[in-house]
């Protein structure tokens, strides 16, 4: 896992698993709302009345409808290596 993904993936995964409604603001100011159905390195699938594939490079901010707690990671734990 790359260091750039070490916060993003667990955060999006919690939003997906717990089906937390989110507002996603795009860089052009458009607001999308729904639940994260799936995601990968480049896109997020957002479900509302339909599924939308949103490219991450177009996203400015992801705002959950409630507070989200990430699992506490030991700062002394060895970093995961890319395989």
Swiss-Prot record:
It holds the Pfam family Hfq. Residues 9-68 form the Sm domain. The keyword Transcription regulation does not apply. GO terms for cellular component: cytosol. GO terms for biological process: regulation of DNA-templated transcription; regulation of RNA stability; regulation of translation, ncRNA-mediated. GO terms for molecular function: RNA binding. It comes from the Bacteria. Keywords: RNA-binding, Stress response. Belongs to the Hfq family. PANTHER family: RNA-BINDING PROTEIN HFQ (PTHR34772:SF1). RNA chaperone that binds small regulatory RNA (sRNAs) and mRNAs to facilitate mRNA translational regulation in response to envelope stress, environmental stress and changes in metabolite concentrations. Also binds with high specificity to tRNAs. Homohexamer. This is RNA-binding protein Hfq. The lineage of its organism: Bacteria, Pseudomonadati, Pseudomonadota, Gammaproteobacteria, Oceanospirillales.
